[in-house]
Amino acid sequence: MSDFVLELDAIERTYVTEAGELPVLRGASLSLAPGEIVGLVGPSGSGKSSLLHAAGLLERPDAGEVRVRGQATRDLDDRARTAIRRRDIGFVYQFHHLLPEFDALENIVLPQLIAGVPSARARQRAEELLTRLGLAERLLHQPSQLSGGEQQRVAIARALANAPHVLLADEPTGNLDPDTSDTVFAAFRDTVRAEGAAALVATHNHELAGRMDRILTFADGHLTPYVPA
């Protein structure tokens, strides 16, 4: 078994546009250890989302290998890749996409039921996560009755519902004001660590990234460790 929950080895990705080929990932590599929260920093269009899509097995890279808990995925068929993604990976996006007709608790219960978790256990897990994220008094509120920060915390709980080993977050606080962003990220960080998971967080916010365990920056499709001046 690998010491890392996620490994990307020399990932290459090029998109074909009307203007020609557009390389966005040029040999990008990283390793993510259990309990580690890593910031992925770069401007819009630098390739952060493409890297997360490759890491989350949503897209196949043109070259390179993605290993999840030591399992190589390059040569697996789509069904096997989907099984790994559902079992081991959770996603948090800038826009939460909560189901509007369900309350906060139901939004966390539903993905567990889909995964085959018994209803009572799924409800208990949902209550525990939402309480840990400071939403104990908002369990039965629908998304429209929650603030933006509360909605994003529900989205974090949903991503953690099935106890993934890896959490991939794409600008998880990007649409929030600074104070709310700080509150949501603190809840995110504390909950991820309490769960024993690891997280890769894409952001253009250097201040937010500075609160993570380490930072990787994008430049010309390559990942490099950030070294403070």
From Swiss-Prot:
Keywords from UniProt, A to Z, are: ATP-binding, Cell inner membrane, Cell membrane, Membrane, Nucleotide-binding, Translocase, Transport
> Where is each ABC transporter domain found?
6-229
Q: Which family does it belong to?
A: Belongs to the ABC transporter superfamily. Lipoprotein translocase (TC 3.A.1.125) family.
State the organism's lineage: Bacteria, Pseudomonadati, Pseudomonadota, Alphaproteobacteria, Maricaulales
Instruction: Name the encoding gene, please.
Output: lolD
Compartment annotation: Cell inner membrane
- Extract the Gene3D superfamilies matched here: P-loop containing nucleotide triphosphate hydrolases (3.40.50.300)
Q: List the disulfide bonds.
A: none
* One cellular component (GO) term of this entry: plasma membrane
- Biological processes annotated in GO: lipoprotein localization to outer membrane; protein localization to outer membrane
What PANTHER family does the record tag this protein with?
A: IMPORT ATP-BINDING PROTEIN (PTHR24220), LIPOPROTEIN-RELEASING SYSTEM ATP-BINDING PROTEIN LOLD (PTHR24220:SF689)
Q: What does this protein's UniProt record list under function?
A: Part of the ABC transporter complex LolCDE involved in the translocation of mature outer membrane-directed lipoproteins, from the inner membrane to the periplasmic chaperone, LolA. Responsible for the formation of the LolA-lipoprotein complex in an ATP-dependent manner.
Q: How does it assemble?
A: The complex is composed of two ATP-binding proteins (LolD) and two transmembrane proteins (LolC and LolE).
Binding, ATP: 42-49
State its Enzyme Commission number(s). 7.6.2.-
Q: What is this protein called?
A: Lipoprotein-releasing system ATP-binding protein LolD
